[in-house]
Curated annotation (Swiss-Prot):
CDD domains: RuBisCO_large_I. Keywords: Acetylation, Calvin cycle, Carbon dioxide fixation, Chloroplast, Disulfide bond, Lyase, Magnesium, Metal-binding, Methylation, Monooxygenase, Oxidoreductase, Photorespiration, Photosynthesis, Plastid. It comes from Pleurastrum terricola (Filamentous green alga). Binds 1 Mg(2+) ion per subunit. It comes from the Eukaryota. This is Ribulose bisphosphate carboxylase large chain.
C-alpha cells in the first residue's frame, strides 16, 4: 500500500491509502440482532489476502472509499461501518472464501429494497481486488422486516379469495408467447380455463405490442374469465401483465384490471425494478388484487457460481418488496434447479421461520415475523409425467404451471388442461391415502389414464421427453 503522509491541515488527519483490514476486518465482533448479515463468496485477486478482500467488501458496501478522507472525522465510523467478522474457505474450491459481513441497520432506508441493494450489491462487485464476488445469502433482521408491507395478500388470503384448498393450483402460459391477436388470445385463455386450470398467464414478454395492445387483451381475457367461471362454477384467474415503460402506465393498467373485476395481475420485477414492484404491491393490497411475479432476467444475475447473486437473495428481496406468486424453478423440468437448494429458497418464500441449514444453502436463520408468504410457481418444461414429483416436492402451497404441457396436447387446450387437472387430483388423492409418490407416481398416473382419455393421450405424447443436464449451482 502507498505510505501515509501527514497534511498541514492538522495532526489528527493523515492522508493516504491504508489497509482495509485495519478498520473493517473485526473477527472479535459479536453480531447484533438488528444487524443485516451477508454471506459473500469471494475470489480474491492473486496476492490479495482473504482478510483484506473481506474487509474491502465490508468497506466498499458501507462507509469506506479508496483513500482516507478528512470528513471521516465528522461522524462515528465505528457506528456505521460494515464489518467482516468471519471468513471461511469454500470446500473443494481453490482461492474461494465465504466472507460474513454485518451491516448496522442505520445504513438503510426503511421499506426500501432499492436502497438495500444499492449498498450491498452495488459498486463493490466491480472492485479490482476481487476476481469475482457472489452474494450467497442475507439475513434480514425482524426490525427491518417490519418496515415492509411484503406480499399484497399472501398464501392463505389467496386461497380464501379463490375458494381453492387442499391441492396445488394449476396454471398455463399462453403460447405462442408473441404474435396472437387479442381475440385469439382470449379464446386460448377460455379453452384452458374451462378445461380445468385455475390460472392462465401472460408471457413475461407480453406488454402492449402492435399485434396486441394491452387494453384489447385485458378485455378479451376478462370475457374469457367470466365465461369459464359461469361454465365451471370455479373462480378463475389470468395473470394480466401490467409491466410497462413507466410507473404511471403500469398503475393505469392495474387500475383497468381492477375495474374489470379480475382477481390477479402480473409484474416482471427484475426488469421493472424494485421501486416499481413495491409501488404495485401496495396498489394491489389497497385494491384487492393478487400479484403474480415473474423473474425474467434472474439468470443474468444468479447463474454463475462465483459471481453475482444467488436466487435465494432475490427471492427474499421479492418477499420484502411484495408478490403473492414468484417463479422458483421446478427441479424436474427444463429450467435449472437443484433439489435441496431449490427447496431451501422455496421455504424462505413461504414459511414464517427458517433455521440455518448449509446443506440447503441457507446461511442464516430467517425470522419473517408474520410477513405474508409468497407462493412458489413451478414452470418450465413440465408435463403430466412430472406431476407426482411436483406434488411430492412442492406440496399444496404452490402453483404448477404447464405451458407446452397444456397447449401441446394433441386434442387441444381444453383436453390438455383436463389432463393436468386429472393428474393432479389423482396424485393428491394417492398422497392423502398414504402412498409414496416418489416410488409409485408412475403407477398412479397410469391408473388415472384408464378413466381419463385426455390424460392417456397426454401421457403418450410426452412419455419420452426428458431434460437431462447437470445443474450449475451445486453446494
Amino acid at each position: 500500500m502507498a505510505p501515509q503522509t501527514e497534511t498541514k491541515a492538522g495532526a489528527g488527519f493523515k492522508a493516504g491509502v491504508k489497509d482495509y483490514r485495519l478498520t473493517y476486518y473485526t473477527p472479535e465482533y459479536q453480531v447484533k440482532e438488528t444487524d443485516i448479515l451477508a454471506a459473500f463468496r469471494m475470489t480474491p485477486q492473486p496476492g490479495v489476502p482473504p482478510e483484506e478482500a473481506g474487509a474491502a467488501v465490508a468497506a466498499e458496501s458501507s462507509t469506506g472509499t479508496w483513500t482516507t478522507v478528512w470528513t471521516d472525522g465528522l461522524t462515528s465510523l465505528d457506528r456505521y461501518k460494515g464489518r467482516c467478522y468471519d471468513i471461511e474457505p469454500v470446500a473443494g474450491e481453490e482461492n474461494q472464501f465465504i466472507a460474513y459481513v454485518a451491516y448496522p441497520l442505520d445504513l438503510f432506508e426503511e421499506g426500501s429494497v432499492t436502497n438495500l441493494f444499492t449498498s450491498i450489491v452495488g459498486n463493490v462487485f466491480g472492485f479490482k481486488a476481487l476476481r469475482a464476488l457472489r452474494l450467497e445469502d442475507l439475513r434480514i433482521p425482524p426490525a427491518y422486516v417490519k418496515t415492509f408491507q411484503g406480499p399484497p395478500h399472501g398464501i392463505q388470503v389467496e386461497r380464501d379469495k379463490l375458494n381453492k384448498y387442499g391441492r396445488s393450483l394449476l396454471g398455463c402460459t399462453i403460447k405462442p408467447k408473441l404474435g396472437l391477436s387479442a381475440k385469439n388470445y382470449g379464446r386460448a385463455v377460455y379453452e384452458c380455463l374451462r378445461g380445468g386450470l385455475d390460472f392462465t398467464k401472460d408471457d413475461e414478454n407480453v406488454n402492449s405490442q402492435a399485434f396486441m395492445r394491452w387494453r384489447d387483451r385485458f378485455l378479451f381475457v376478462a370475457e374469457a374469465l367470466y365465461k369459464s367461471q359461469a361454465e365451471t362454477g370455479e373462480i378463475k384467474g389470468h395473470y394480466l401483465n401490467a409491466t410497462a415503460g413507466t410507473c404511471e402506465e403500469m398503475l393505469k393498467r392495474a387500475e383497468c384490471a381492477k375495474e374489470l373485476g379480475v382477481p390477479i395481475i402480473m409484474h416482471d420485477y427484475l426488469t421493472g425494478g424494485f421501486t416499481a414492484n413495491t409501488t404495485l404491491a401496495h396498489y394491489c393490497r389497497d385494491h384487492g388484487l393478487l400479484l403474480h411475479i415473474h423473474r425474467a432476467m434472474h439468470a443474468v444475475i444468479d447463474r454463475q457460481r462465483n459471481h453475482g447473486m444467488h436466487f435465494r437473495v432475490l427471492a427474499k428481496a421479492l418477499r420484502l418488496s411484495g408478490g403473492d406468486h414468484l417463479h422458483s424453478g421446478t427441479v424436474v423440468g427444463k429450467l435449472e434447479g437443484e433439489r435441496e437448494v431449490t427447496l431451501g429458497f422455496v421455504d424462505l418464500m413461504r414459511d414464517d421461520y427458517i433455521e440455518k441449514d448449509r446443506s440447503r444453502g441457507i446461511y442464516f436463520t430467517q425470522d419473517w415475523v408474520s410477513l405474508p408468504g409468497t407462493m412458489p410457481v413451478a414452470s418450465g418444461g413440465i408435463h403430466v409425467w412430472h406431476m407426482p414429483a411436483l406434488v411430492e416436492i412442492f406440496g399444496d402451497d404452490a402453483c404448477l404451471q404447464f405451458g407446452g404441457g397444456t397447449l401441446g396436447h394433441p386434442w387441444g387446450n381444453a383436453p390438455g388442461a383436463a389432463a393436468n387437472r386429472v393428474a393432479l387430483e389423482a396424485c393428491v388423492q394417492a398422497r392423502n391415502e398414504g402412498r409414496d409418490l416418489a416410488r409409485e407416481g408412475g403407477d398412479v398416473i397410469r391408473a388415472a389414464c384408464k378413466w381419463s382419455p385426455e390424460l392417456a393421450a397426454a401421457c403418450e405424447v410426452w412419455k419420452e421427453i426428458k431434460f437431462e443436464f447437470d445443474t450449475i449451482d451445486t453446494l
